[in-house]
Amino acid sequence: MVSQEQYQGDIQQAEEKILLFLRTFEDIQENMHFGRIPEAQARLRDTIGDFFESAPSTLTILEPPEDLKEFHSAFSAALAHLNNSSTGFLEGVPGPNFGGAFVNSRFSLCRGLNVLYNQRAHLPTLRSYWLLPEAESTRDALEPQTDGVGVPVGMIHHPQTPEHADYSLYVPEYYTPDKTWPLIICLHGGYGRGDDYIWTWLRPAKSKGYLLLSPKSLGPTWSVLQPPVDSRSIRAMFDEVCETYSVDSSRVYLSGLSDGGTYAYLLGLDQAELFVGIAPIAGELSPAADGMLRQKQGIDVPIHVVHGVHDFIFPVEAVRSSNELLEHIGYQVKYTELPDWSHALTYSINETHVLPWFESLEPKAQA
């Protein structure tokens, strides 16, 4: 059996490879252009080399100290998930069916992230991945050693019930009920999941003290044609969270990606009393909103629309037109058009565009 120092040294080497993989793959996913898949695959392949092929045999040979056997098993499982993710992406055939390979790769990645996050106490090299750079100096304060608040904290996954779909919730590890906490509701894209999209928001939430509620749609995507179907589900989740945690009702925000952005318009205008602001990203203003627009429903809620010039799902010309319509009616619209972005995930977009805008808004006046 190797010494604990030797064992941790070998694990640290693996961590360094994993950190490089995670950062590279994140950048690829956020800047994905489906016309340039081979280039993205080549970049990822160059980054990881044969790490995932060799790591399992290395871990098998590496016998952990007794007190790290449970960690060793979890770490091995995380590597398997990351390997599945990498393999699925690299072996996906560019073309119309690549989207399915990408989604499955993403789900495997997030399963791996979940395991790594739960084992972060043993993985110091990876700790920087979970935080914004400016929060590094306060890292220890963001990870208290004791849990005395009486409610679950960290990354929590709730199953479906008759009242709501399944959802993922992040509660900062330093949560205390002695104060109220702002909440961001973030809606995944079509064929996505809550336990997938929540990871794009983890760094700012953990670093700055936000609760995250990331719902799963009841169907493969959001009920845009029948908005009440998913809105009832989301409201039930929201009420459940508010019953358990000390939520600042004057600072509840809504954002969504792609179909989630489309649904953010509908949910945000329909339940405007809940939200300080709504931020649809790479979505469209659906005709299902026509009735609400005619009645100027939710007209006092600021909207920040974020869209890429090269979006191939929802063309930017249509988004520009819908922004003009909203402004003509009297809605408060801020528009950020990203000249180099297409239609992809939103890590840095959440961190550099959406959250700063949320934080610029005045808290909602309480009745």
Residue ranges and their predicted role:
Residues S217-G219, G283, L338-D340:
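Active-site loop/turn elements of alpha/beta-hydrolase fold enzymes
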Residues V306, V316-A367:
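C-terminal catalytic histidine-bearing segment of alpha/beta-hydrolase fold enzymes
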Residues D195-R203, E284-K296, E317, S321:
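Alpha-helical scaffolding within the catalytic cores
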Residues C242-E243, S250-I299:
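Primarily recognizes the serine-hydrolase "nucleophile elbow" in alpha/beta-hydrolase
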Residues E173-K179, S223-S258:
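Gly/Ser-rich "nucleophile elbow"/oxyanion-hole loop immediately N-terminal to the catalytic nucleophile
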Residues M1-T180, Q366:
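A domain-start/cap signature at the N-terminus of enzymes
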Residues I299, H304-H307, D311:
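Short beta-strand/loop motif that positions the catalytic acidic residue
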Residues Y175-S223, P287, F312:
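Short substrate-entry loop that stabilizes the transition state in hydrolases
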